Amino acid sequence: LVNWGDMTSDSTDTLTFRVESSTAAGSTTSAIAQTFTYRLAAAITGDNWGDATSASSVAVTAAANDSMALVIDVDPAAVTAADTDAKYLNLAIDSVIEAGYVSAWALIEDRYPQSEHLTST
């Protein structure tokens, strides 16, 4: 879930979100772009989410999309299929804005879901 507040920008300033898998922490040249499903919320005063849309990146215009949230859902099986050695998922946020605040948090699912995890003991 990515949230942002009021942005100081003009009509051309954007936030672009990508999800990349990698064998190294942080974005690298060997990172693989992941396809994800996203939903963009209405402004904070609204109670409406946009339709679920599949993409490898999503760009929002800062001036038209102040104080919104973006839900990004990545299928763990797709990450494994694209890059079996991936240890990291990076949320890449490219911004062309003068000023603003962005926060993100993640709920991580197991790569191999099971009812009881095996231990080494």
Cite the ranges covered by each PLM segment.
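Surface-exposed, low-hydrophobicity beta-strand/loop segments enriched in small/polar/acidic residues
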Residues: 1-121
